[in-house]
């Protein structure tokens, strides 16, 4: 993948690669490097080929999906399951880059679960985007009409759709 993360430093002169992309993955990679260094100092024998294979195949090994994952081209459709203010702030930075660099309109299909910092997340989203508010098919999902009301308080504009499929198709 062109957008995957590669890191070189003195501890890993041949570099590390992960198939995950997104600005926040740099921070995650450095956390992994710190953990590996700590475990090595504690005499854990973690083989280089094991952590390299784990990082390179993290999606296949864990089933992780939706971390700044490009699922379609022309138009570009990017999926990200960011669910807290920190994650959304990283997403906002990346969306700003796309918006400014390519002068593209940004359309966001958006749903939330009801046990997160909904107001904080909504405040962290870009105001210039067009939103398609929806309810995911999970028990904890916030109804789309409630989400729209909170989004409008945060200065966001959009329309509600009862399902994710309908929101994407709109």
Region locations from a protein language model:
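Short acidic, glycine-rich loop/turn motifs
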Residues: 6-12
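Nucleotide phosphate-binding/pyrophosphate-handling subdomain across enzymes
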Residues: 12-130
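C-terminal helical cap/extension that packs against the catalytic core
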Residues: 1-6, 76-78, 119-170
């Amino acid at each position: 993948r062109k957008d995957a993360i590669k890191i070189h430093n003195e501890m890993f002169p041949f570099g590390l690669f992960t198939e995950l992309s997104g600005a926040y993955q740099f921070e995650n990679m450095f956390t992994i490097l710190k953990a590996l260094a700590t475990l090595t100092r504690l005499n854990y024998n973690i083989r280089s080929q094991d952590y390299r294979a784990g990082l390179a195949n993290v999606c296949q090994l864990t089933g992780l999906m939706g971390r700044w994952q490009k699922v379609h081209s022309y138009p570009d459709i990017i999926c990200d399951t960011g669910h807290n203010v920190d994650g959304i702030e990283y997403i906002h930075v990346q969306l700003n880059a796309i918006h400014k660099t390519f002068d593209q309109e940004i359309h966001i299909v958006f749903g939330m679960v009801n046990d997160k910092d909904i107001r904080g997340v909504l405040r962290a989203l870009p105001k210039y985007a067009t939103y398609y508010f929806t309810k995911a098919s999970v028990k904890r999902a916030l109804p789309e009409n409630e989400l729209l009301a909170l989004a409008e308080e945060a200065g966001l504009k959009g329309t509600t759709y009862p399902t994710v499929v309908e929101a994407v198709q709109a």
